[in-house]
């Protein structure tokens, strides 16, 4: 399995209700300290690196064959559209740019444009070591 992009407590899980039940989370929100490093979960090419309403400072990495990872609510983005990144490379810094009450990272995995539960794909460093 892949490593989660940041260490911290998952406060919102895939499929949980939000906005008084009108919407569901398409990813997970990981509480983490402002400025904490955000790591790419896999090798790929940055296809978006900018501010997007609802996501704040967002980076999207295409991993090929329809697989993408999304990293939102960042304080800073360290790679630009078109850049290639390696698994484990620092790509951003945790922030609160997406309008959440706490600092942290919003993280999604998409396959052919459809959100998938990141917890089916990723583990913490502690879980990997066990």
Q: Language model features by range: what are they?
A:
Residues 1-48, 53-55, 60, 110, ...:
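Extracytoplasmic/periplasmic cell wall- or extracellular glycan-interacting regions that localize
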Residues 17, 58, 74, 94-100:
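Gly/Ser/Thr-rich beta-alpha loop segments that engage phosphate groups in nucleotides
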């Amino acid at each position: 399995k892949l490593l989660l992009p940041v260490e911290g407590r998952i406060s919102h899980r895939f499929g949980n209700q939000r906005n008084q039940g009108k919407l569901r989370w398409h990813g997970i929100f990981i509480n983490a300290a402002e400025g904490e490093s955000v790591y790419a979960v896999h090798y790929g090419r940055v296809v978006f690196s900018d501010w997007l309403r609802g996501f704040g400072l967002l980076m999207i990495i295409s991993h090929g064959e329809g697989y993408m990872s999304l990293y939102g609510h960042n304080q800073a983005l360290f790679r630009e559209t078109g850049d290639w990144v390696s698994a484990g490379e620092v790509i951003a810094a945790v922030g609160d740019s997406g309008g959440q009450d706490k600092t942290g990272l919003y993280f999604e995995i998409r396959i052919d444009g459809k959100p998938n539960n990141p917890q089916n794909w990723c583990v913490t460093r502690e879980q990997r070591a066990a």
